[in-house]
From Swiss-Prot:
Protein name listed in UniProt: Chorismate synthase
GO molecular function ontology, one term from the record: chorismate synthase activity
HAMAP family: Chorismate_synth
The reaction(s) this protein catalyses: 5-O-(1-carboxyvinyl)-3-phosphoshikimate = chorismate + phosphate
Length: 369
C-alpha cells in the first residue's frame, strides 16, 4: 500500500491500524535545534482524543505519545522523529457482523476490491483513528512555525449540519467540545446531537482553519502550488468531501470588481483569495474551509451486499462519532501546519536569499478593517 507519506522536505509517514497494537508516524526533515518534549505533542493530541464528551465516540484511548527517536536531551537532532501511540481500548467483537458484509459509505468495499484483503476491525487502516499521529506531527510543525516565523494556525467549527455557527471570539473555541467560536450556541448544538443519537443517525460539519503570520512567498507553482497542496492534504482527512480556499465556491457569484483583492500602499483591501495568489502566499491570513460528510457508521438499518455479492441489510454497532467533525478541528489545523512547514523549508532552500525593492504591504489596509 502506497500513499502513506505527506510532504516533500518535511515528510510524515503514518503507520498502524485502528485495532492493531499501536499507531504512529515517522517525521523526516524536521530542522535540528528545536526544543521538543512529549508534553508539547500531548497538548495537541489531548484536543483530538476520543471519549472527551458524550457527543463523540466513547472509545477510551489516552493517546499517550512516545517519542522514540530524533530528540536528544530535549532538542530535535535533525534525524527522523518517530512517534508511537499505543491502542488500549479496542473492542473488535463489535465488528463481527461485518466480516462478510460491506458497510455503506465506508472504505470496506473499495479496500476489498483493490487489495483483496480487509481488516474489518474498526476499518483498519482506513479508520479516522489514524488522524492521531497526524495531529502529533502537526504539533511539531505548529511549534516550529510559531517559534521561527510567528505563524499561528487555529481552527473552529463553523457549521454543524444545518446550524450555522457565527464567529464571536477565538477564546470561545477552547471552552466547549465542539470547538465552536460562539459559546451561546453550544446548548443548541448539544440538543441537536442528542436528538441525532436518539434517532441512530449522524450529520456532517464544516471546519474553518486560519493561518496568521505566514510571510509572502511560500508555494511552488505550477503543480506544487500552496493552495493545491493544502487541498491535497485536507482531502487526506477521513470523511472530508470538499475544500475551499478563501471565498471558495462563493467566488462563482462574485464579480471581478469584488473578488479581486485590491492592493494599496497601506495593504490589501480584501482577502477573497484566502491568502494565496498564483499558488504563492500573499502575507495575508490563509483561510481554509473543509466539508465533512456524516458518519457512515449509524444504527439505522441499510442495504448492502456480502462478499459473495448477495443482498444484505446491515446495522452498524460499536462506538462511533455521530459527527466526526466535532473532533476534526485539531486535525485540520495539523494538516495545514504540515503543508506550511514543508513549503517554508522549500522556499528557504530555493529562494531564501531573494529580495526585491518592493515593500511588503500589510495583510489588510487600515480602511479595510
Amino acid at each position: 500500500m502506497s500513499g502513506n507519506t505527506l510532504g516533500t522536505l518535511f515528510t510524515v509517514t503514518t503507520f498502524g491500524e485502528s485495532h492493531g497494537p499501536a499507531i504512529g508516524c515517522v517525521i523526516d526533515g524536521c530542522p535540528p535545534g528545536m526544543a521538543l518534549t512529549e508534553a508539547d505533542v500531548q497538548l495537541e493530541l489531548d484536543r483530538r482524543k476520543p471519549g472527551t464528551s458524550r457527543h463523540v465516540t466513547q472509545r477510551q484511548e489516552p493517546d499517550q505519545v512516545e517519542i522514540l527517536s530524533g530528540v536528544f536531551e530535549g532538542v530535535t537532532t535533525g534525524a527522523p522523529i518517530a512517534l508511537l501511540i499505543r491502542n488500549t481500548d479496542q473492542r473488535s467483537k463489535d465488528y463481527g457482523n461485518i466480516v462478510e458484509t460491506f458497510r455503506p459509505g465506508h472504505a470496506d468495499y473499495t479496500y476489498w476490491q483493490k487489495y483483496g484483503v480487509r481488516d474489518y476491525r474498526g476499518g483498519g487502516r482506513s479508520s479516522a483513528r489514524l488522524t492521531a499521529p497526524v495531529v502529533g506531527a502537526g504539533a511539531i510543525a505548529k511549534k516550529w512555525l510559531r517559534e521561527r516565523f510567528g505563524v499561528e494556525v487555529r481552527g473552529y467549527m463553523s457549521a454543524l449540519g444545518e446550524i450555522e455557527i457565527p464567529f464571536v471570539d477565538w477564546s470561545h473555541v477552547r471552552e466547549n467540545p465542539f470547538f465552536a467560536p460562539n459559546a451561546d450556541i453550544v446548548p443548541q448544538l448539544e440538543g441537536y446531537m442528542d436528538a441525532l443519537r436518539k434517532d441512530g443517525d449522524s450529520i456532517g460539519a464544516r471546519i474553518d482553519v486560519v493561518a496568521s503570520g505566514v510571510p509572502v512567498g511560500w508555494g511552488e507553482p505550477l503543480f506544487d502550488r500552496l493552495d493545491a497542496d493544502i487541498a491535497h492534504a485536507m482531502m487526506g482527512i477521513n470523511a472530508v468531501k470538499g475544500v475551499e480556499i478563501g471565498a471558495g465556491f462563493a467566488s462563482v457569484a462574485q464579480r471581478g470588481s469584488v473578488h479581486g483583492d485590491e492592493l494599496t500602499p497601506d495593504g490589501f483591501v480584501g482577502n477573497h483569495a484566502g491568502g494565496v495568489l498564483g499558488g504563492i502566499s500573499t502575507g495575508q491570513d490563509i483561510t481554509v474551509s473543509i466539508a465533512i460528510k456524516p458518519t457512515s457508521s449509524i444504527r439505522t438499518p441499510r442495504r448492502s451486499i456480502t462478499k459473495a455479492g448477495e443482498p444484505a441489510v446491515i446495522e452498524t454497532f460499536g462506538r462511533h462519532d455521530p459527527c466526526v467533525g466535532i473532533r476534526a478541528t485539531p486535525i485540520a489545523e495539523s494538516m495545514l501546519a504540515l503543508v506550511l512547514i514543508d513549503h517554508a523549508l522549500r522556499h528557504r532552500a530555493q529562494c531564501g536569499d531573494v529580495s526585491t525593492a518592493t515593500p511588503k504591504i500589510a495583510a489588510r489596509a487600515p480602511q479595510a478593517q
